[in-house]
């Protein structure tokens, strides 16, 4: 039976996060590197592709036996969940990760914030000439929250728990890494909370859903 599981939760930003958007039409005096925003609301967003790519990169470091120059060279377990365009071995991704829009705008504004982002001034110094190169980086503020929404297609019950454990491992590793750019300078530390899975298409036994949620609950432990 065609079955899909929805995994929901919250991504909480613990340190200022920068996922870059376009500055092609920035006015004079505007920030050098703006964050990506939803065009309708103007709220900061996390593209699903950014989260999926980061998850896969971390899993590749942990699970691949050697350095993979291309995603198609990832181990079979990763390709099974995230997909592969390898010639002769094409695999459809089992997960769909939706774009995530800032969800706690009212809470942030009630804390006295006039803006949903902050601008951090940074500087690089040329060691040879001592010439400074200042720049302005826009960041999503600490305390921002984004609603996580992932759909997982059940293709093989025999590896269902193994696939969910892979996703949970990616969440765990990301909490000790960073999302977006400039992680080495303290940007982009995040936390996953309120993870919950339910069947939205087809049917699974309650015991199966309970086991999936047990696996996901270990992410925040």
Model-inferred region functions:
Residues 1-125, 129-221:
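RNA-binding basic/glycine-rich loop and surface signature characteristic of RAMP-family CRISPR effectors
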């Amino acid at each position: 039976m065609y079955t899909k599981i929805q995994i929901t939760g919250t991504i909480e930003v613990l340190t200022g996060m920068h996922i870059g958007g376009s500055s092609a039409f920035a006015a004079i005096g505007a920030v050098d590197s703006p964050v990506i925003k939803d065009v309708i609301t103007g709220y900061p967003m996390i593209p699903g592709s950014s989260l999926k790519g980061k998850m896969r990169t971390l899993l590749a470091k942990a699970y691949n036996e050697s350095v993979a120059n291309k995603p198609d060279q990832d181990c079979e377990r990763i390709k099974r969940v995230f997909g592969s365009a390898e010639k002769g071995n094409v695999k459809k991704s089992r997960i769909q990760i939706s774009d995530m829009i800032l969800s706690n705008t009212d809470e942030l504004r009630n804390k006295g914030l006039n803006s949903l982002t902050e601008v951090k001034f940074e500087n690089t110094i040329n060691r040879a000439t001592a010439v400074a190169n200042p720049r302005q980086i826009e960041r999503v503020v600490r305390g921002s929250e984004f609603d996580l929404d992932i759909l997982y297609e059940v293709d093989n019950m025999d590896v269902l728990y193994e696939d969910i454990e892979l996703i949970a491992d990616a969440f765990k590793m990301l909490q000790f890494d960073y999302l977006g750019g400039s992680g080495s300078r303290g940007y982009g530390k995040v936390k996953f909370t309120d993870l919950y899975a339910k069947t939205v298409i087809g049917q699974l036994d309650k015991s199966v859903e309970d086991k999936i949620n047990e696996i996901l609950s270990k992410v925040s432990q």
